[in-house]
């Protein structure tokens, strides 16, 4: 069965989902039947074809009236502001990938369902009343047919949750802190300009900028036992893609740095293959651009202090890795719903 997908919002994640679908060779499993985006179709086609972070798209892209063509595949283009007015029933949509970054409540998900979609997957953390939140590689096996409105969490949650799970299962985590070192995003300014967050009034290319993060809440959503025992801070840095996460945890069992690395390396080669990778080369952030893994552990940066404090550095392509997980979760949702 081929899953019929519609994409709502054709920004960074929406476009990368389409690129990842074609580059990963999964068109027999997923077909994009429609994209809803308020921008004009010519601009959509141009930004799909030419991307500053990921280069030229290898597939031919063209726009004709209300259709976007990728190769010979026609995708209907919509410019609808009202979720309730979207023609999902007419188009036979199985799963809507809502990549707007704006919608994320149960009410928004129900609007897609009312318009005719069978399932909805949000590309960012949703409200607590969604059916479930998935970090693929960790809990997708808990998906059920009755789960209609789902969140794919965030890029940073997908990056750090697998590593936390591995360390907790092996050594027993007592508490932890996380620092996200995230590339600049669209909600920052090119030059100094007004923003409700005064730090984000400043030019993104000129400063390391602290921002608020809900990553600690995302961690405790998956690990309730860590409530009040994990904290997170975040800074934005003047790069356009790839993120690093500095993770520090105190653990119950004594451990050495080489043992931590061996654990994570074996996981990357085994149970978490394709989700977690492990590297010991002297690499920098740009080397992880277009990497499809959720997390790449930098073994050169692992430290252990006093046998119980572990520090690790984990990389991710916050666009490309997450877009690939959107596809994985879509297939997982369809498998349990339509088998």
From Swiss-Prot:
Keywords: Cytoplasm, NAD, Oxidoreductase, Pyridoxine biosynthesis. Substrate binds at residues 154-156, 200, 213-214, 236. Its EC number is 1.2.1.72. It comes from the Bacteria. Pathway: Cofactor biosynthesis; pyridoxine 5'-phosphate biosynthesis; pyridoxine 5'-phosphate from D-erythrose 4-phosphate: step 1/5. PROSITE patterns: GAPDH (PS00071). It is an enzyme of class 1 (oxidoreductase). GO terms for biological process: pyridoxal phosphate biosynthetic process; pyridoxine biosynthetic process. The record marks 182 as: Activates thiol group during catalysis. InterPro entries: E4P_DH_bac (IPR006422), GlycerAld/Erythrose_P_DH (IPR020831), GlycerAld_3-P_DH_AS (IPR020830), GlycerAld_3-P_DH_cat (IPR020829), GlycerAld_3-P_DH_NAD(P)-bd (IPR020828), NAD(P)-bd_dom_sf (IPR036291). It is found in: Cytoplasm. The keyword Oxidoreductase applies. The active site is at 155 (nucleophile). It catalyses: D-erythrose 4-phosphate + NAD(+) + H2O = 4-phospho-D-erythronate + NADH + 2 H(+). One of its GO terms (cellular component) is cytoplasm. NAD(+) binds at residues 12-13, 81, 318. Catalyzes the NAD-dependent conversion of D-erythrose 4-phosphate to 4-phosphoerythronate. Belongs to the glyceraldehyde-3-phosphate dehydrogenase family. Epd subfamily. Homotetramer. PANTHER family: GLYCERALDEHYDE-3-PHOSPHATE DEHYDROGENASE 2. NCBIfam families: E4PD_g-proteo (TIGR01532), PRK13535.1 (NF010058). HAMAP family: E4P_dehydrog. This is D-erythrose-4-phosphate dehydrogenase.
